[in-house]
Amino acid sequence: LFQSGALWSSMTVGENVALPMQMFTRLEPTVIRQMVELKLGLVGMLHAIDQYPSELSGGMRKRAGLARAISLDPDILFFDEPSAGLDPITSARLDELILNLRDGLGATIIIVSHELSSLFHIADDGIFLDADQKTAIAHGSPTWLRDNCTDPVVHAFMHREQLDSSGPHGDG
């Protein structure tokens, strides 16, 4: 799932969700329509089946993109910054939706995220990637990474909220 939802703007939400099924299955149009309704229902977007992406809020576009992402019942779902650009309440709802889909579909979820609250809520395990070193520099649960990892880059990332609240010089 892309940050923006990556929906085709000239297609309705329903058409966007149907597209992978039309391209990669031999399902009859009536079955595809039923599957589209099911997938949109799973993400709470059935009411928007005939709307265009431009008519949706950012959070709704992400949920519609998620419905399309699960249209073929994948074993693995990839999310790129799923809560980027969302307010905290919508972000928390999206986190819950991701967890519900993971549990309901039995899919493996891989998330790239800088949102600590989402990581602690969703992730069982984390791998910390360092762009400068172009390698994985730490691995463990979010709690372990926060409380036990001695790598200075990981420590700074996992404790940045404390740094942000105290100001750049720790003077509060």
Language-model segments: what does each one mean?
Residues Y52-L56, M60:
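Conserved ABC ATPase signature
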Residues A92-G104:
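Helical segment within the ABC ATPase nucleotide-binding domain
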Residues P88-T90:
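Helix N-cap at the start of a conserved alpha-helix in ABC-type nucleotide-binding domains
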Residues M11-L19:
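Short coil-to-helix segment of the ABC ATPase nucleotide-binding domain corresponding to the Q-loop/switch region
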